[in-house]
């Protein structure tokens, strides 16, 4: 029944397609019913690249099952003839996994070179998107990486960048800029844009850089165990974490440089990392000290997402913007322990671990923070509650797959994050000013009701009768106490993004003090008692 609702993670099929669709000359064949070709549409809608997804469906039909035949061998032949890929990844869907067919045996009857075929026979009922993607990428690295001498100049591999990643291409540009400033070459980026030859050349790099905890650690572990390659797995999200990341990278590179008898790589002036080469690499340190941003020190924030962006965002909000973290959570249970370890001392309450968006929405409604950093699901939930929300993690909508340069990592990413936090919290004030001065010729508020309202009268526009979204979220609450017109007028002067919370607290105060109706006097007393 949960498939009728939003899910945070996609299927195993979606996960492995994120890897194969990232790579060159790699084609994926799904042994699946016709409906599972939705994945192709997902990439054409969201990825915003000129290439068509290298995905094909070996359609399973009831007729074929009755006859005891399979279309898989024929599909593999067609893919080989039309696309000539270096590797064909074959995988079952949830439906075809129930058939328990031997896909390896079926593939052998296709006539295609078996060395080109990789059967990724993952259990789609036990494995979801991230684990499937990580497993396939690690398997490809194990299969193709070859022993070879390292590059003459300092170089790194950037691992974990995949199709449909969160602001992936911008993050890649941001890290490339930093590496170029340091004089460090990029040996291979994988899986994004990599071919099989690139995977073979991975051991030529000096260090493996893995900025995402969900994708790449398995491959880096294998390269370390088999080829002795060191890896850097910090998250350069924010100004100070980026500086720490650069120092850690230089330390790893200089150890290898010393072994090769090469000079050490020195830390360049910070201005070299800026876009103009003259100013500070990020405006966050001074921006956080402005009067406008210092008001954020009292604001409460809740963060929910994948492992990487939850950890990075909590530290950014707390350490660099001075916001109060009231809680954090993730939908990736397998990474929960790592998140707890990374955020030790940051969270006042235990980490929330759930893949049910309703539980996250309830948490937000109970706490009513001034800012939520979450996924597309939290954006929808917060819209109903009039709580400011910024998306910092997958799953996302199309507005988070942008053509422009919007990194999350590095110095440039720190500026983007600060801007997003500021605008998410501040843009709602425009609507609040219309609420506040609505009777000053703006014709935003309707005339005050003559009789006592039920506590949920919504303001309407002068023409369309559109309810004020600040009150719309309360319209379905049948347990509200009656409010007098004067009290309603005072309530509308409260900013819309905390209005629901103020209404709830005031009604609780009135009940505790035996008041039957909330008047202006009761509202004032509640405000004084609750510290407002």
Curated annotation (Swiss-Prot):
For whether the record's keyword set contains Iron-sulfur, the answer is: yes
Question: Where does the record place the region Disordered?
Answer: 445-486
**Required cofactors, per record?**
[4Fe-4S] cluster
Pathway of action: Porphyrin-containing compound metabolism; bacteriochlorophyll biosynthesis (light-independent)
Q: Catalytic residues per the record?
A: 292
Pfam families hit by this protein: Oxidored_nitro (PF00148), PCP_red (PF08369)
The terms under GO molecular function for this entry are: 4 iron, 4 sulfur cluster binding; ATP binding; metal ion binding; oxidoreductase activity, acting on iron-sulfur proteins as donors; oxidoreductase activity, acting on the CH-CH group of donors, iron-sulfur protein as acceptor
Q: Where is the signal peptide?
A: none
Protein name, please? Light-independent protochlorophyllide reductase subunit B
Please name the gene that encodes this protein: bchB
């Amino acid at each position: 029944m949960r498939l009728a609702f939003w899910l945070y993670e996609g299927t195993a099929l979606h996960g492995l397609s994120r890897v194969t669709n990232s790579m060159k000359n790699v084609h994926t064949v799904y042994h699946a019913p016709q409906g599972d070709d939705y994945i192709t549409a997902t990439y054409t809608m969201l990825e915003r690249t000129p290439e068509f997804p290298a995905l094909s469906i070996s359609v399973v039909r009831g007729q074929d099952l009755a006859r005891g035949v399979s279309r898989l061998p024929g599909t593999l032949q067609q893919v080989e003839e039309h696309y000539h890929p270096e590797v064909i990844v074959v995988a079952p869907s949830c439906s075809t996994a129930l058939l328990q067919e031997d896909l390896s045996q079926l593939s052998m009857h296709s006539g295609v070179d078996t060395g080109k075929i990789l059967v990724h026979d993952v259990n789609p009922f036990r494995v979801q998107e991230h684990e499937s993607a990580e497993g396939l990428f690690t398997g490809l690295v194990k299969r193709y990486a070859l022993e070879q001498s390292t590059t003459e100049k300092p170089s790194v591999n950037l691992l974990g960048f995949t199709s449909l990643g969160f602001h992936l291409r911008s993050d890649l540009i941001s890290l490339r800029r930093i590496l170029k400033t340091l004089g460090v070459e990029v040996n291979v980026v994988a899986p994004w844009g990599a071919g099989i030859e690139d995977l073979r050349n991975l051991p030529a790099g000096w260090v493996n850089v893995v900025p995402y905890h969900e994708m790449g650690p398995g491959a880096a572990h294998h390269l370390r165990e088999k080829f002795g390659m060191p890896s850097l797995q910090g998250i350069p999200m924010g100004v100070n974490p980026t500086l720490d990341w650069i120092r850690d990278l230089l330390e790893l590179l200089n150890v290898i440089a010393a072994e090769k008898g090469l000079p050490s790589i020195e830390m360049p002036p910070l201005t070299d990392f800026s876009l103009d080469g003259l100013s500070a690499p990020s405006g966050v340190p001074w921006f956080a000290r402005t009067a406008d941003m210092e008001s954020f020190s009292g604001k409460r924030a809740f963060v929910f997402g994948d492992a990487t962006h939850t950890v990075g965002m909590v530290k950014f909000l707390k350490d660099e913007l001075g916001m109060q973290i009231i809680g954090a959570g993730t939908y990736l249970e397998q990474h929960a322990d790592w998140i707890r370890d990374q955020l030790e001392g940051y969270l006042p309450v235990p980490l929330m671990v759930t893949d049910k968006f309703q539980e996250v929405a309830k948490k937000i409604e109970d706490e009513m923070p001034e800012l939520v950093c979450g996924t597309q699901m939290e954006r929808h939930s917060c819209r109903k509650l009039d709580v400011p929300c910024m998306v910092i993690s997958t799953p996302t909508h199309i507005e988070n797959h942008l053509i422009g340069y919007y990194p999350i990592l590095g110095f440039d990413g720190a500026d983007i994050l600060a801007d997003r936090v500021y605008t998410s919290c501040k843009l709602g004030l425009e609507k609040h000013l219309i609420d506040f001065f609505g009777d000053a010729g703006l014709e935003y508020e309707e005339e005050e009701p003559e009789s006592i309202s039920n506590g949920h009268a919504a303001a309407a526009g002068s023409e369309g009768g559109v309810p004020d979204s600040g009150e719309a979220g309360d319209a379905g609450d049948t347990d509200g106490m009656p409010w007098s017109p004067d009290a309603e007028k005072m309530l509308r002067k409260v900013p819309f993004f905390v209005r629901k919370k103020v209404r709830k607290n005031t009604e609780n105060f009135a009940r505790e003090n035996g008041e039957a109706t909330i008047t202006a006097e009761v509202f004032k007393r509640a405000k004084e008692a609750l510290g407002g």
